[in-house]
Amino acid sequence: MNRSLKLLTIVLLALSTFSLNAQEQEEPKSSEELAKELANPNTTLGTMAFPIDFIMYNGDLTDANKQYSTSINFQPSLPIPLSKGVNLFVRPFIPIILSQPTYGANGFEQRGINLGNISADVAVGKTWKTKTITIVGAFAGFPTATDEDLRTSEVTIGPEIMVAQLFSWGAIGAMVNHAWGVSGDTDDQADPDEFSIMGNIPRHASITAGQYFYVVNLKNAWQITGQPTWAYNHRADEGSRFTFPIGTGVNKVTKFGKLPVKLTMQYWYYVAKPDPFGPQHQLRIQIAPVVPLPW
């Protein structure tokens, strides 16, 4: 695990150095201009996003309401322009789990620092003359967690689609993907006495998930925003299939020296979650340096 963290640290330091050096070669834009461009999901601006999530849980299990988790994630986005208004996106999502509850025969246990399950999407986005944006691609999730109790049971893969509309005041949109399990042993069933919020995914999973989002531009590079993510697990037990939050927050684009940085804080409240155990409150803080593209 220490080797994984060291490797990730080296990669992040290299990316940060690239960001600072490349930034000097770009004609500077105002923070307000950058904020409006970043509201466009088909933007050609590169970002190195670090979402930090703190989640509090609830449910029918004993002590469920005393559980919490914390993670630091990394999601780079360096769009590749293919033609005017058309871009290719390759976006990995790498979670580092600082604390995460699991449930077994002895009740809840907190797991320490671990690499989580990495996911990624590859998609092509197009901006139409009507300022409508469509993005179509594929999503995949991988069982990479270094703790077996946090590791999903199989690789999942499937299509994704996003539709958004740009306005003078901001943007709204929604993304949906569906992932099927494509690996794992169907005879290797999970222990009924074991429960992990990280997965709770049966063999050969079938999960529909997505995100709805909105951005309202304000003065001085401030924005009202929300980007909650939801999921529907088709093969979970009744009462444990749907997870859905409502959320809102703020963005602020500012500059540290010559480096623009997008700062975000959001609160999500889960109006639907698995009955035994699921998220109830979530605070997301995100730090996202804005970087020039290397191509």
Name the predicted role of every residue range.
Residues M1-A35, W295:
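Cleavable N-terminal export/targeting peptides
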